[in-house]
């Protein structure tokens, strides 16, 4: 009898799971924000593009500077690539995003977000796996809504 070399699937590290969770949530936010034809509007400049073509899930509070808000839906909204990658640092996209956030959630909530930005938030591998599973289910529902399944 031949012995097979079956590679055991290595468990993902918390960092790998966090990255997957971020990507999954950003996709979900874009899908939820899309109209029935699959188009999203950039919260910073107003450009309209298909949810999966030139639109990203932009973070109001940068994901690298806040573990507290990085995986919260209220912190992520559709942004075109230009605004998300370049405009937040070199243009006025950040100011326009702030105005959007204040109109959407109110100044008090935005101020609380900014105050909480440096708070630590400890998540474990199981937390990430649960979030990913939940968000993937919601993604399926949104894709069905758009007929993109």
Language model segments and positions:
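Short beta-strand-alpha-helix junction that forms the catalytic/metal-binding core
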Residues: 40, 66-87
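A boundary/linker detector
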Residues: 1-28, 33, 47-48, 113-149
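Short, surface-exposed acidic
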Residues: 105-115
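Juxtamembrane non-transmembrane "cap" segments at the membrane-aqueous interface
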Residues: 97-98
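Cys/His-coordinated zinc-binding microdomains
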Residues: 46-47, 61, 84
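Short Cys/His-rich "knuckle" micro-motifs
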Residues: 52-60, 90-94
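Short cysteine-rich loop/turn motifs with clustered Cys
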Residues: 23-56, 80
């Amino acid at each position: 009898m031949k012995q097979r070399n079956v590679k055991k699937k290595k468990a993902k590290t918390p960092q790998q799971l966090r990255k997957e969770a971020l990507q999954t949530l950003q996709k979900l936010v874009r899908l939820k924000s899309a109209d029935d034809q699959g188009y999203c509007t950039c919260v910073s400049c107003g450009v309209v593009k298909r949810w999966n073509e030139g639109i990203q899930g932009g973070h109001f509070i940068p994901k690298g500077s806040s573990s507290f808000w990085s995986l919260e839906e209220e912190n992520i909204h559709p942004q075109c690539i230009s605004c998300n990658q370049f405009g937040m640092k070199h243009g006025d996209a950040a100011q326009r995003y702030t105005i959007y956030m204040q109109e959407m959630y109110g100044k008090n909530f935005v101020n609380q977000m900014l105050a909480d930005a440096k708070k630590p938030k400890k998540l474990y591998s199981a937390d990430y796996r649960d979030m990913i599973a939940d968000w993937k289910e919601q993604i399926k529902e949104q894709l069905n809504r758009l007929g993109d399944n």
